[in-house]
Amino acid sequence: MVVFLSSFSRVAQKFSCLFSLFAALGFTVAVNYSYAQDISPSTDQDATVTYPATYFAEFDPYSVSDMLDRIPGINVARGGGQGGGGGGPGSSGGSNRRGLGAGGDQVLINGRRIAGKENEGNDQLSRISASQVEYIEIIRGTSGDLDVRGGSQVINIVLLESESSSSIAYELNVDRTWDSAYNPGAKVSLTGQRGAVDYFLSGEREPRYELNQSREDSVLPDGSPNDRIQRETKQDAQPLTLVGNFGYEFSERDLAHLNLQWSEDNQDRELDRIIADDKFENPVLSLQFEELPRDSESWEFGGDYEHEFLNGSRFKTLFIVNEKDDLFTRERYDVDNLDRSKNLFISSSERTRERIVRTSYTFDVFDTQSLEVGVERAQTLLDTSLQLGLLTGGEVSDRFGGLTPVTDANGMVEEMRYEYFAVHNWQLSNRMSMESTLLFEDSTIKQSGDISQSRDFDFVRPKIDYRFDITPSLQFRTTIEKDVAQLSFGDFTTSAQTNRGSDDDQNQLEGNPDLVQEQSWRYEANLEYRLPNDSGVINTNLFYHELEDVIGKVDVSTVEDVLSANGNIGDAERYGLKIDSSLRLGFLGQPNMLLTTGLNLEDSEITDPFTGMKRRLSRRGRGNLSIGLRHDIPSRNMNWGFNVNDGFDGANINYDIDKTEEYGGSYSYFSWVEMVGWGGLTYRFEARDNNIRCRTRIRFENRTIGDGGLRELEKSCFTTGAVLALKVRGTF
């Protein structure tokens, strides 16, 4: 409690002025913009907002996702309910979260959570036909009856019930990239019910073609030119995803669901590189070519069973089994006219498996209190293999691409984790609720291969979630939570760089078998105001995080080489303010215009392990600003809009032992025009930005020794060009 009070005091000092300013601004806007609508959703006493299907009828939506886009403030709910400080260091959220947990993505289908991590409720929103929806709920309160917990809001999609019904939705699309390449794709889904069985099937193959061009200019410490590098990368892929969800109602008190997903993503990627060495009076040109194919295949099988007892208590079991296989190969050649000479070979494979089962029992303690108790068992396994071959003149091997073996690393990591939890929900009054969680976690991580060891961990993770409905439209929420992040087991072993923008001078990433989990105490306060008559929503979130064992780069240098690896670099703090607004422009006579804005301000502080100086967390930045507009024109069966997002420059820096990399603001835009036309089909035209990104990389000799000595300054920018897309959608 002492830690909490001191932390909250620091937050108050940092943000009291900003909070007052924005709160005043929000209420001023709310008063001025509250204009009535002809059709309004209903708001229950428990602050649940219900949108019947008739609310969306005039917009002729194609999918559930289209319906949600018309709801003011839906961006807050679709953010996973994490608030302004969601994610980041020390967080266990997202598809990489620890096990199943009680959260998920805060989307329910017919009041039930889909048992999956890669195949959750949010993934189904663009696949389910709007014609199958009876109503949509935005649940702003807490309840022991909810299948997910912990989010600021929960979206519940309730589908129509009938003895026999089905609906097919399909989409044909084509992307045009800036090199005039046309890449087709398609989606199809079937949603239906037959007696006690409900089902959902879908398949999609999406274009993922990309042409990336970049230029890099490098200078030496004295300002003289070093070299210039031009790169052109082509990537061609069409990932295929198949999904099936089935439900069976044995009786009014017994339900079961099965969920399946399989996906395949085989990428063909090639890179051409032109290097101009400017250290000579006449620049020396050299050419390189790389082949970088990547093949991925994954599947997931999950399910749940629920039984409701006569006294209203519930027993529920969920399980998930999944696997992902990933193979990345990199072969680099020096090019001389038509001759190619291979000088680098990398083969990196990973196989990840999870086996999770979660069981809980929920019952009423008193009329206004409920308790859920349960246990979760999760096994996670990772098998890795890395082969690195170089042209050194030594003995060669076919397994290393016909080059000399340099690295042959193999490893296996297994985590066996047990989680025991109790969740108490207390409706203090018809306007106040408090949900408290106590979770104990016990795990063992074993490693074998190049390094063999076993380590045990245990954590106690409490959480308090308090909500006060000041009015049905105005809600205050505050949470205090201890969180533990999932480790990336790939950091334990030596691996290859596979991401775009990786360092040409670094062939592999070192592993660190001594990593421990990031932990955090997370404090958040949230104020949400829903304007009368569905005119809009204003949401303000203030957060402060105390971080322990933050993961960053640490020194693992040898006598011969300066090396770093991901490791725990100490404690840190992160704090910020997020304001979201979603307003209908009824005051301009345009009630079907929805203006959405977002302002995210954040800062952080940690001690750099190499220099001992205070700095921000790697790649966290200072926040971003977003604005979007959607205009529905029902009389013409059309809508149009745009979304723009820009990050603040000057603080998005990645820190390493021998370099720093500063990234510019991530500006992006997206616009569309959509209309219902010939054949009753929906035609949608989209335009996406050219994705220009810039980076300044400063190389040092070794930052652990004084200032390390400046070695090189690199400035680079890349673009993937604008993308135009045409989509044709229909249902029957």
Predicted regions and their residues:
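Short acidic/polar hinge/loop motifs at secondary-structure boundaries
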Residues: 112-140, 188
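Gram-negative outer-membrane beta-barrel transporters
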Residues: 543-546, 565-650
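Outer-membrane beta-barrel signature, preferentially recognizing the C-terminal barrel domain
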Residues: 290-298, 350, 411-413, 484-539, ...
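Face-selective signature of the C-terminal outer-membrane beta-barrel domain
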Residues: 243-265, 290-449, 469, 540, ...
